[in-house]
């Protein structure tokens, strides 16, 4: 776990014109749709009376220590409607990662329709030279690295296939001006733990503020939150390293082994499936399968 002194001093304060309202440039942890806010909202709802603006205010906070990792829970409450939002922050110290998710709670008597419920939003230091790295591909060409300078406006990676696949992977990496390599350089990175329709939005405004928001895709999706019910978003795990993309990969890999995978299999060698019909196409018989098995044995396959 790195110390706070490892990360240097905060960047310069934002300079804005007098006619630019603070609501338009404030860096909220979980912005809701409504008022004069122009960046990607994490939360967008429709109340039973047709009102769609959400005005969230801090209500309380708690630190939980009875789980696998210490967890901060910040509760926000709408000023006018019975809607509570719990922001969860799990600190995985040994992995240098923060896991975030949100819980929406309807404490009233009427249903609330959830139209967008992202898991988290991450703010980056002020800079206009960021490079975004993503992973995409196809059958036979999985996990191709794509790199692009973060433009003014939005850059969206997404999947509308109903699954997470080689075509679009819910992961991002960001560095300054393409200066990071596998072994050195500042890298901000994260992965969304969700296998359905998802999106990650990277957005930079005219003042050089850059943020990353992600979660369940709002495309063709709404959720009816009845009275007394709650809705929990998937987790969005993110971190920072000054040691390049290689260290970012290893931090996520160790997290997957130590936290995500079942305890019964995380520390054991898993069996390998040898897809033998590829070498014979559909002409499968005992002789050619036995020959393939002998070659597999020479490679160390059990």
Give the positions of each predicted feature:
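Polysaccharide-binding surfaces and accessory modules of carbohydrate-active proteins
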Residues: 1-203, 219
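Short Pro-Gly-centered flexible turn/kink motifs
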Residues: 53-56, 223-242
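Short loop/turn motifs at secondary-structure junctions
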Residues: 98, 113, 232, 300-302
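Conserved, mostly hydrophobic/aromatic
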Residues: 102, 227-228, 274, 296
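Active-site beta-loop-alpha junctions enriched in small/polar residues
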Residues: 117, 195, 236-238, 274-279
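Short acidic, Pro/Gly- and aromatic-enriched capping/linker segments at domain boundaries
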Residues: 208-226
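Short, Lys/Arg- and Gly-enriched loop/turn segments at beta-strand edges
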Residues: 239-251
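An acidic-aromatic substrate-binding cleft motif
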Residues: 251-302
């Amino acid at each position: 776990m790195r110390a706070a002194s490892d990360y240097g001093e905060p960047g310069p304060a934002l300079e804005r014109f007098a006619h630019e309202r603070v609501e338009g440039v404030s860096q909220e942890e979980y912005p809701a749709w409504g008022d004069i806010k122009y960046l990607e909202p994490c939360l967008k709802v429709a109340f039973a009376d047709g009102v769609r603006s959400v005005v969230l205010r801090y209500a309380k906070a708690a630190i939980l220590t009875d789980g696998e990792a210490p967890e901060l829970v910040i509760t926000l409450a709408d000023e006018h409607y019975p809607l509570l939002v719990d922001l969860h922050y799990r600190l995985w110290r040994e992995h240098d990662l923060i896991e975030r998710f949100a819980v929406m709670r309807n404490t009233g008597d009427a249903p609330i329709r959830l139209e967008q419920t992202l898991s988290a939003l991450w703010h980056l230091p002020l800079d206009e030279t960021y490079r975004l790295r993503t992973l995409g591909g196809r059958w036979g060409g999985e996990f191709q690295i794509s790199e692009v300078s973060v433009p003014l406006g939005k850059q969206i990676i997404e999947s509308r296939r109903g699954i997470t696949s080689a075509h679009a992977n819910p992961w991002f990496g960001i560095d300054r001006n393409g200066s990071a390599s596998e072994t050195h350089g500042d890298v901000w990175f994260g992965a969304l733990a969700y296998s359905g329709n998802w999106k990650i939005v990277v957005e930079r405004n005219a003042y050089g503020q850059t943020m990353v928001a992600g979660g369940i895709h709002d495309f063709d999706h709404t959720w009816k939150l009845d009275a007394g019910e709650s809705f929990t978003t998937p987790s969005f795990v993110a971190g920072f390293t000054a040691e390049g993309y290689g260290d970012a990969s290893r931090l996520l890999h160790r997290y997957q082994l130590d936290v995500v995978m079942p305890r019964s299999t995380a520390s054991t060698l898993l069996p390998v499936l040898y897809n033998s019909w590829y070498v014979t196409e559909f002409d499968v018989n005992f002789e050619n399968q036995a020959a393939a098995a002998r070659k597999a044995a020479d490679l160390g396959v059990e």
